[in-house]
């Protein structure tokens, strides 16, 4: 059964107790930020725009800030842990491998957002504080979410620097691609333990005033061997969308079970990146060495019958293994990378939307079977 709740953005904004401007950054804790920055530059077409490290006074960590459109990644490695934050990052990489430590959200008032969140049950991991330099002032605060992930609340209204105070502008690592690869971060998906999905959905409902956008349970989100459940929470403007998955009992180990085992607990499973031209994006990324999940040719034999006309011909979708889905609002095109590190944990989705604000419900079976084939190769099904 699938339940869908549609929003009326204008009404939602008027009553929004926790207004947001959008995703500020996805912050990764990684073993080698310099190499990771090179990978995301060459493989994903991201552009280095800012840096913080020993050369400009940061003795404990090195961080590389990469952007493409409004999508921003921050890749951070510990050089020599000396503070609780440095030890936390080092322990995070040791336990989880490379992974997302922070889904930072831009807000118009970080102090008010933090106060509202704490009043409604969130755990603070950083009280509101200011960072200043010649570019202005940024106000930040942070709250905990599932696993060891946090949400830093960022108010950069009075700031025009390259990222945050303490960072300096940096030149791209490689020649920027001829075409912008991505437009924005579309959504960020979290995996949580069995029986805890509703707990975390309730957390976002209560702490951030987010509402339930979609729900996927039962046959919609199962194969012959594995199953999971998923609910999507979003702010009133739909700028910030967080699907939350949990495993369901089935014959074999699901992709969520595999993630939880190898990540060592709950965390961010994948980041969806919005593109205006998925064909160009996938061709460019494939040429740069990014591996995508495979889709059997049989998927495309009847695709045109139930999806209808799309911007991209079915033959091109078949060639590139891109999935398509249609709902009452329009259609979307999507494809998923394989995990981008040796642990079968974090991966990416590329999505092109044409009216649809869905998540590819019609593709779930094909997608999960593709993931199961990869699990079987790894001996984890």
From Swiss-Prot:
CDD domains: HPPD_C_like (cd07250), HPPD_N_like (cd08342). Binds 1 Fe cation per subunit. Keywords: Dioxygenase, Iron, Metal-binding, Oxidoreductase, Phenylalanine catabolism, Repeat, Tyrosine catabolism. Pathway: Amino-acid degradation; L-phenylalanine degradation; acetoacetate and fumarate from L-phenylalanine: step 3/6. Gene3D superfamilies: 2,3-Dihydroxybiphenyl 1,2-Dioxygenase, domain 1. GO terms for molecular function: 4-hydroxyphenylpyruvate dioxygenase activity; metal ion binding. Residues 22-156, 184-338 form the VOC domain. Fe cation binds at residues 187, 270, 349. Its cofactor is Fe cation. Pfam families: Glyoxalase (PF00903). Its EC number is 1.13.11.27. It comes from the Bacteria. PROSITE patterns: VOC. InterPro entries: 4OHPhenylPyrv_dOase (IPR005956), 4OHPhenylPyrv_dOase_C (IPR041735), 4OHPhenylPyrv_dOase_N (IPR041736), Glyas_Bleomycin-R_OHBP_Dase (IPR029068), Glyas_Fos-R_dOase_dom (IPR004360), VOC (IPR037523). It catalyses: 3-(4-hydroxyphenyl)pyruvate + O2 = homogentisate + CO2. GO terms for biological process: L-phenylalanine catabolic process; tyrosine catabolic process. Belongs to the 4HPPD family. Homodimer. This is 4-hydroxyphenylpyruvate dioxygenase. The gene is hpd.
């Amino acid at each position: 059964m699938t339940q869908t709740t549609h929003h009326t953005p204008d009404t939602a904004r008027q009553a929004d107790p926790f207004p947001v401007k959008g995703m500020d950054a996805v912050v990764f804790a990684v073993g080698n930020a310099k190499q990771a920055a090179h990978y995301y530059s060459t493989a994903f077409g991201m552009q280095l725009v800012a840096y913080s490290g020993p050369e400009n006074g940061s003795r404990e960590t090195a961080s590389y800030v990469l952007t493409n459109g409004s999508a921003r990644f921050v890749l951070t490695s510990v050089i020599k842990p000396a503070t609780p934050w440095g030890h936390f990052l080092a322990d995070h990489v040791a336990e989880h491998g490379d992974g997302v430590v922070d889904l930072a959200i831009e807000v118009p008032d970080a102090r008010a957002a933090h106060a509202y969140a704490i009043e409604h049950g969130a755990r603070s991991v950083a009280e509101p504080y200011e960072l200043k330099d010649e570019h202005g002032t940024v106000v930040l605060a942070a709250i905990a979410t599932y696993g060891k992930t946090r949400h830093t609340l960022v108010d950069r209204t009075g700031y025009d620097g390259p990222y945050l105070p303490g960072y300096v502008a940096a030149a791209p690592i490689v020649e920027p691609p001829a075409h912008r690869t991505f437009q924005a971060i579309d959504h960020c998906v979290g995996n949580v333990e069995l029986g805890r999905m509703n707990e975390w959905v309730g957390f976002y409902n209560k702490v951030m005033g987010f509402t339930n956008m979609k729900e996927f349970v039962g046959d919609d989100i199962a194969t012959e061997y594995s199953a999971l459940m998923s609910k999507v929470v979003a702010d009133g403007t739909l700028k910030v969308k967080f699907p939350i998955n949990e495993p369901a009992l089935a014959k074999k180990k699901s992709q969520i079970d595999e993630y939880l085992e190898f990540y060592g607990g709950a965390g961010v499973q994948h980041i969806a990146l919005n593109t205006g031209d998925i064909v160009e994006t996938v061709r460019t990324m494939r040429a740069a060495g990014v591996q995508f999940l495979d889709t059997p040719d049989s998927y495309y034999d009847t695709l045109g019958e139930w999806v209808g006309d799309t911007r991209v011909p079915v033959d091109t979708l078949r060639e590139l293994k891109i999935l398509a889905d249609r709902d009452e609002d329009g259609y979307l095109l999507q494809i998923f990378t394989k995990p981008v590190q040796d642990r079968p944990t974090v991966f990416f989705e590329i999505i092109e939307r044409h009216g649809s604000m869905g998540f590819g419900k019609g593709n779930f079976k094909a997608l999960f079977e593709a993931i199961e084939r990869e699990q079987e190769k790894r001996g984890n099904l």
